[in-house]
Structure formats: C-alpha cells, structure tokens
C-alpha cells in the first residue's frame, strides 16, 4: 500500500483546501519544491501534484512550480541512488500538447479528471498516445461524478464511467470522495472497495485519511485492487506521520514498492 503525499498548488504556493473550496485555502508552504523534498525525506515513494488554479481555469497555471518540484525530485533520486520516484499531476489538462509537454518535463503520470467526463474522446486519444501514463481522476459525491473542480455534480455513476475509461486503456483510477476530502472524516472504504472490485486496473483512494487507523483499514482491503492512498491534510496537520504510516503499511501488506529499492 503506497502512501502518496499531495502537493496542491495555488498561486505558486502549496496549500490545502476544504472540500475543494478555493476560498478555504490554507497555505502550508510558499516553496513547493522544498515541500516535495520534505516528503521525500519522510519516505515518500511517489508524489501527487494538483494545479488547483488550472483545475478551475481549464489550462495549466502552476507550471513553474511543477518544474521546480520535478527538479527537486530528480536531485533527491540521484543523490540517493534511486532510479525513479514517480510524480503525477492533475488539474487543467485539456489537450494532448499539454500532456506531452508535462511528460517531457519529467512527470510519470498525467491525471485527467473533468476533461475525461466531458470529452471522453480526448481521454481515449490520450490513452492511445501515451499508454501507461494516463490516470483518470474521478471525484464523486454519493456515487455521482463531480466535475470542474468539484463545483458541478453530473448524473454519471462513478462505476459506470470507471469501467468505460478502463476499456480506453487508462493506467489506474484515483477515486476521491469529495464529501470527505480535507475533512479528515475517514476514508469511504465501502465505496472505494466497491469501485475497485468492479475493475481490473488499480484504484488509488483519496479523501478523508485522518490517522493510522484509516491506513490500516485500507491495507486490510488492498487485495481488492487498491494500490495506494493520497494523503493531504492529515500529514500537513500532523494527525498522520508519513514515515511511520508507510512503515506500518509495508508491515501489514508485506511488501515495499520498487521505488524504495
């Protein structure tokens, strides 16, 4: 079970939102690259970046911050003899040129969310053009998919869309319960497992992690197809210690991802 720190970018800073509300942003660092280094030193094996401005604007808005993070990751990997530390990014990615540019910059995975729901043809083309590097981010409330930075609720059932996108060839699904994200109310295990059981590709849980008990609960259902969990407010506010939580997850699942070698 992989614990993936989230670095949410707004106006070049690292922030956390409550339930996707841009007006409820807490700035945790004005230096995103330094924040990336911090999580790597705490044992992170993968990083999750979100361009919040981009998610609302529909185009990249924090590219310089992303590049600085990627540079920090490269330097850390080289210094420690690590072959690769994957970095994934979502927010405002609406065309193939943007995907190609980001991948050329050094990102391992591109997360497509709203654009996948609104323009499935784009997702299909992206999966074909960049096999193994496209992740779909599905944000849902009460089983219905939300779009546009969570500001709009669609009529699509999350499982139906996930199956469709799996057929397109996406690498994995990030499932966020937006009723719980940033609120630390515990992961929606039941909904996450239900989604994972319906797919053959991995599901990454997101939203609601509060403490080590949430991590242990996810580890207990990892075999249902849950690859990891994205951690945000809990690791920033200290209710979850990333290093000890990852160690505990490794102990419970009796494995360590290759990037830790």
Swiss-Prot record:
Assigned EC number: 5.3.1.16
Residues at the active site: 8 (proton acceptor), 139 (proton donor)
Reactions this protein catalyses: 1-(5-phospho-beta-D-ribosyl)-5-[(5-phospho-beta-D-ribosylamino)methylideneamino]imidazole-4-carboxamide = 5-[(5-phospho-1-deoxy-D-ribulos-1-ylimino)methylamino]-1-(5-phospho-beta-D-ribosyl)imidazole-4-carboxamide
Entry keywords, A to Z: Amino-acid biosynthesis, Cytoplasm, Histidine biosynthesis, Isomerase
Record-stated family: Belongs to the HisA/HisF family.
Primary gene name: hisA
UniProt name for this protein: 1-(5-phosphoribosyl)-5-[(5-phosphoribosylamino)methylideneamino] imidazole-4-carboxamide isomerase
One MF term in the entry's GO annotations: 1-(5-phosphoribosyl)-5-[(5-phosphoribosylamino)methylideneamino]imidazole-4-carboxamide isomerase activity
Compartments reported by the entry: Cytoplasm
Pathway: Amino-acid biosynthesis; L-histidine biosynthesis; L-histidine from 5-phospho-alpha-D-ribose 1-diphosphate: step 4/9
Example of a GO cellular component annotation carried by this entry: cytoplasm
Major localization listed first in the record, in broad terms: cytoplasm
Organism the protein comes from: Janthinobacterium sp. (strain Marseille)
EC top class named in words: isomerase
Gene Ontology biological-process entries: L-histidine biosynthetic process; L-tryptophan biosynthetic process
Positions in coiled-coil regions: none
Taxonomy, superkingdom: Bacteria
């Amino acid at each position: 079970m992989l614990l993936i720190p989230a670095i949410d970018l707004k106006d070049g800073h690292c922030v956390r939102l409550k339930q996707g509300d841009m007006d409820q942003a807490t700035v945790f660092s004005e230096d995103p690259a330094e924040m990336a280094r911090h999580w790597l030193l705490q044992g992170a094996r993968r990083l999750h970046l979100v361009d919040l401005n981009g998610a609302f604007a529909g185009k990249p808005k924090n590219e310089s911050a992303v590049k600085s993070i990627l540079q920090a990751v490269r330097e850390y990997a080289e210094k420690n003899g690590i072959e690769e530390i994957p970095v994934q990014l979502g927010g405002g990615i609406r065309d193939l040129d943007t995907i190609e540019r980001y991948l050329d910059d050094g990102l391992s995975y591109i997360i497509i969310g709203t654009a996948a729901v609104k323009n499935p043809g784009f997702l299909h083309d992206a999966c074909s053009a960049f096999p193994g590097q496209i992740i779909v981010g599905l944000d849902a409330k009460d089983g219905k998919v939300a779009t546009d930075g969570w500001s709009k609720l669609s009529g699509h059932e999350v499982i139906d869309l996930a199956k469709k996108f799996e057929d397109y060839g996406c690498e994995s699904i990030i499932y966020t319960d937006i009723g719980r994200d940033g609120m630390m109310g515990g992961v929606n295990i039941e909904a996450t497992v239900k989604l994972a059981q319906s797919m053959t590709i991995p599901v990454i849980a997101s939203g609601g992690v509060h403490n080590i008990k949430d991590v242990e609960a996810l580890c207990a259902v990892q075999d249902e197809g849950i690859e990891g969990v994205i951690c945000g407010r809990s690791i920033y506010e200290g209710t979850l210690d990333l290093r000890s939580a990852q160690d505990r997850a490794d102990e419970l699942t009796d494995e360590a991802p290759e990037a830790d070698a």
